Structure formats: structure tokens, C-alpha cells
Amino acid sequence: MKIFAQSKPLKATISNIAADKSISHRAVIFSLLSSGTNKIENFLFAEDTEHSLEIARKLGADIEIKEGIVFIDAPKKIVEPDCILECGNSGTSMRLFMGLLASVEGFFVLSGDEYLNERPMKRVGEPLCKVGAKIYGRLDGDKAPLCIQGGKLDFFKFKSKIASAQVKTALILAALNSQGCEYSEPELSRDHSEKMLKKMGADIEISGLNLKVKPLTKPLDPLEIFIPNDPSSAFYYAVAATIIPGSKIILKNMLLNKTRIEAYEVLRKMGANIKFTPKSEIYEQIGDIEISYAPLKAVEVSENISWLIDEAPALAIAFACAKGTSVLRNAKELRVKESDRIKVICEGLKCCGINVTELEDGFKITGGEAEPAIITPYGDHRIAMSFAILGLKCGMIIENSECIATSFPNFGKILKQIGANIED
């Protein structure tokens, strides 16, 4: 992908942002515990979520897609597949299915691509194994491929050392299908799972950072959901609007869950003009976000990191365009994403002539005039999209940009729609 420096403001109302990836995954996986037909509108059709759909099929789900709407009927009993369950680059697919399948009678093998198979899985596998799960993998169960000999698990209590929605959801799924659990985390991670499962009839008691999950006594009620648009995917355009003078972008039908808009709040602290307009709420609050240009100033960020971990690469681009030195800390989790994002962000910004210091748990970036560069994203969709946005300031070539399709196939199309000059 080649991006040319922008010579005019970006102005658009965008309604075709990618549907929320987190909720799309969960809608598919939770449907496997339901009875009846699940109806999922505005599903995200991207490589990551399609892996979850295909795994659900291999586990016995009847899946039909009509005019973009996904209909899922769960099997009466999850089927033991005769093949490997391929997760591609999707850590969400692998970790959530680990939790579900650890509590299901049968033998299952989960694997991913070269990048996913190097990401840590013990954070999910270890607590499950302590209560009777049988999960085997490379490096003592920390790396895929993973073999799971599923079965009913005992009641368990688990105090997580990290705020991770994937870990939390995996353990909730295992508990629902077994004897229940008590779960706590150090700070609130994304809470889509608790909200969706409670709406589907799960008995989950929420008290601050603590959950009590009771085992299912009957199948969950089927979902009927319209998935809102993804604020993480939309955030690239928000950053674009704040760094290109005169720009104004309106993002329609966005998920406004407070655990998902923290990065927008950081942009607001940096001086950006941002307005939220809530419109409706069923499973989650949905509304519009309006962003218009304003000069950005430096900021220090060290709290609620789990709420903006996916947006951190794009925030780094905002930091690079701000006046002063910005700092992100307590974000060590970035090192075990699709790439070592701390290292790759810092390498990329240095290539662009930006003064950046790599920290163990984040980075320090002094804003300045970025220079054109050729960026290698190391198979990481969020790195590729973030540097594409910086390219609007200075010009950029993103090598191997096809990785963007894992989460946001229409990214380039929408960039053109809002007035950017790019070549795929």
C-alpha cells in the first residue's frame, strides 16, 4: 500500500466502518451454548472472525448466511472434529475456544499461523489445568498447536494478574459449562462477555472487579443482535482527522462501551475536538462520534491501559504529531500481540525521523515532522493501519499490507472514501 501526503482536509460521514470484532467473535462462540436460532446482523466478515465461524461449523453448528445476516443453530452436543481447528491469526478465537472446549467431552486441536503460534496461551491454559483441564502444547502448554482433552471441570476461584477480556471470557465459558467459578481481575477489562451472556440467560453476578458464574442449568437463549461498528477500527480515522488540518469525520453507529472509547478520551485530553452522541442501547450502547481537527499537545498515559491496548499503535501516531513529549506506560501486553508492538512501533517511528524511546512497558515519543518511509508491519494489521495514517502527513509505503484483511478488509476503501490518496 502506498499513501501520499494529504494536501486537503479529510471530510466525511462514515457508516460502513467494520463491525465490532470482539462482539462478532463472541456472538459466534456464545451461540454454541444456546438452543434455537441465533440471528446476528452486521457481522464482521474478516479473516479473524471467519475462523471462528468455521470452527463453530466443525464443532457441529448449522450456519447459514443470508443477505449478510448470520444464522446459527447450535448442535445438541458439540461434535468432536476429525481435523485441526485453524485459528489463523486470531488470538481471540484460540483463547475463547480453549475455555469452551476444555469443558466439553472430546479431543480437540487448536492451531494458528506462524504469528499466533508464538503468542502466549498459558495465561488461559494454566488456570484451567489447575481445575482439571487437560491442555497440552509446546513450551509446557504456552504455545500452539494445543491439544485439549475436554471434560467437566471442578468449581474454581481465579484471581487474574492481568486485565484481559480474553482470559476472563475463556474462564467464564469453562465455568458455565462445568461447575461455575469466582473470578477477579486487577482492573476492569472489556465487559462485552458478561453483558451478552447475562442477556442470554446466564447467571453471572457482577460486583466491581469480581464475577460469580453459576453453571448453566439449561441452554442459553438465542442471540438476536445487531453488532455495532468497531471503535478500535474507527480510531484510525479519528487520528487522521486530528492530524490533518481542517478535517472533520463523523463515525456512525459506533459501540460506545466505556471500556472501548478510552483512546478517544486520550485524544480529547490531547486537545482533539470529539463529541459522542448516544442513540440506543440493547446489548451495548450505540451512537455516533464526531472528530474534528485541533492541534494536539503531549500527554502521559498509564491508567486503563487494557481499555486502549488495541488502539495504542494509532495513539503512537497521534503522539508523533503532537507538540511535546508523550509517554505510554504499563502497556507491556503490547509485546505479546500479533507482533512485539512496542518494538515495531518504535522502529517504524525512527524510520520516519521521529524521536522515540523504547521502554520496557511502553514508549516515549516527541512529536515532530515525520519523513516518508517504507514500513514492514511484521504481519500485524494494527501496525500497518497505524503507519498508513501517518502516511497522510508525510507519505508512506506499507509492505505486505494484506495483513490488514485479518480485521478490516475495507480499511483502504474507506481511506479513499474520506479523501485520502492511496494506491493498494
Curated annotation (Swiss-Prot):
Looking up InterPro entries in the UniProt record yields: Enolpyruvate_Tfrase_dom, Enolpyruvate_Tfrase_sf, EPSP_synthase, EPSP_synthase_CS, RNA3'P_cycl/enolpyr_Trfase_a/b
Is Transcription regulation among this UniProt entry's keywords? no
State the EC number(s).
2.5.1.19
Q: Name one GO biological process term.
A: amino acid biosynthetic process
- Pathway stated in the Swiss-Prot or TrEMBL entry: Metabolic intermediate biosynthesis; chorismate biosynthesis; chorismate from D-erythrose 4-phosphate and phosphoenolpyruvate: step 6/7
- Broad class of enzyme this protein falls into: transferase
Q: What is its main location?
A: cytoplasm
Q: Where does 3-phosphoshikimate bind?
A: 21-22, 26, 164, 166, 310, 337
So which domain of life are we looking at?
A: Bacteria
Q: What does the record give as the reaction this protein catalyses?
A: 3-phosphoshikimate + phosphoenolpyruvate = 5-O-(1-carboxyvinyl)-3-phosphoshikimate + phosphate
Q: Which UniProt keywords apply?
A: Amino-acid biosynthesis, Aromatic amino acid biosynthesis, Cytoplasm, Transferase
**Single GO MF descriptor:** 3-phosphoshikimate 1-carboxyvinyltransferase activity
> Pfam families from the xrefs?
EPSP_synthase
Subcellular localization, per the record?
A: Cytoplasm
Q: What is the role of the protein in this entry?
A: Catalyzes the transfer of the enolpyruvyl moiety of phosphoenolpyruvate (PEP) to the 5-hydroxyl of shikimate-3-phosphate (S3P) to produce enolpyruvyl shikimate-3-phosphate and inorganic phosphate.
The protein's name: 3-phosphoshikimate 1-carboxyvinyltransferase
